[in-house]
Amino acid sequence: MELEVRDFTTEINILDSEKFSVSDEIFKCPFNQALIHQVISTYLTNSRQGTRSQKSRSEVSGSNKKPWRQKGTGRARSGSVKSPIWRSGGVTFAAKPKLYAQKINKKMYRGAIRSILSKLVCDNRLFLVRNLFIKEPKTKLLLEKLRTITSKKSILIFTDFLDKNLLLASRNVHKIEVRTATHIDPVSLINFNVTLIADNVIKKIEKQLV
């Protein structure tokens, strides 16, 4: 299949843009919602640190002596200052460090990314861009260039390398992120409304996802 290539350095009209041949195996796959859900759930689970730790009543520092006698004081009975119902007491069912990591094979992971990319192409939310750089690290300049391609404000940009000017210009803009083609992941692809890919890295992405 062929995709239009936009030029980042000029305000070129879509009708005048060039065509770029891309792999049908990567950008024309059927949408597999079940696979995408499974891969994203695993990806998010693996990003959990699992380091939270709370103290149970047996671990809290304090005396084990009964605060007052069982009967005769008129107060509610109590057996320990470390009771979970007391202030500064232990936690009931205290959380402990836990490993949340799950495994998912490469074939499924790549398949999910191919499915997402194909859906983006189908929805006209993925664009190939030539000369994806700016001459000065100016946010205003970057936004002007992006407006010639899309009116959306949530944009994910993939380049061959992290251009310093592009990175600095996008750093203080909410929902605009610049990455290299080697850092493509399913969660980012669905979190942004539009994805821009430099035309010189499209073959590298195809090679990763075959």
Swiss-Prot record:
GO-annotated cellular components: ribonucleoprotein complex; ribosome
Keyword rRNA-binding: yes
GO biological process terms, semicolon-separated: translation
Matching SUPFAM superfamilies: Ribosomal protein L4
Pfam families: Ribosomal_L4
Protein name: Large ribosomal subunit protein uL4
Region (Disordered) location: 47-83
Keyword match RNA-binding: yes
Family, as annotated: Belongs to the universal ribosomal protein uL4 family.
Keywords: Ribonucleoprotein, Ribosomal protein, RNA-binding, rRNA-binding
Regions of compositional bias (Polar residues) in chain numbering: 47-64
Function: One of the primary rRNA binding proteins, this protein initially binds near the 5'-end of the 23S rRNA. It is important during the early stages of 50S assembly. It makes multiple contacts with different domains of the 23S rRNA in the assembled 50S subunit and ribosome.
GO molecular function: rRNA binding; structural constituent of ribosome
Subunit and interaction comment: Part of the 50S ribosomal subunit.
Annotated InterPro entries: Ribosomal_uL4, Ribosomal_uL4-like, Ribosomal_uL4_dom_sf
Domain of life of the native organism: Bacteria
Gene: rplD
Disulfide bonds: none
